[in-house]
């Protein structure tokens, strides 16, 4: 399972295969913790088009409150990450036949996951 870190100062996202000591902006960061089940605002919508699963969200993307990334970890161990900035549309595409875990992170509420 991938381990994720997020720097609250500059917005950098770090990943590792195992827990690690991660430093950024003069601070040591702990691994992100799971926020539990996403409420309606933190859920991802999915539609299938031309053999692709397209994940989107109606989550706010303001400077203060936004999804910083969506990541997919394939069962083979490969990770694909899409980073988002405030005011950027949340959109993440996967081949329909890919299976594994999808992770997404809200800078205020934490990390979410689901099997896909």
Model-derived segments and their meaning:
Residues 1-2, 16-19, 101:
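Flanking scaffold residues of small Cys/His-coordinated metal-binding clusters
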Residues 54-57, 89-97:
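Exposed aromatic-hydrophobic patches
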Residues 6, 86-91:
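Aromatic sugar-binding surface patches on proteins
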Residues 7-10, 22-24, 106:
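Short cysteine-rich clusters marking metal-coordination/redox-active sites
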Residues 35-86:
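Long, charge-rich boundary regions
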Residues 14, 28-29, 110:
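Cys/His-rich microdomains that often coordinate metals
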Residues 108-116:
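Edge beta-strands of extracellular beta-sandwich domains
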Residues 18-29:
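Cysteine-rich micro-motifs
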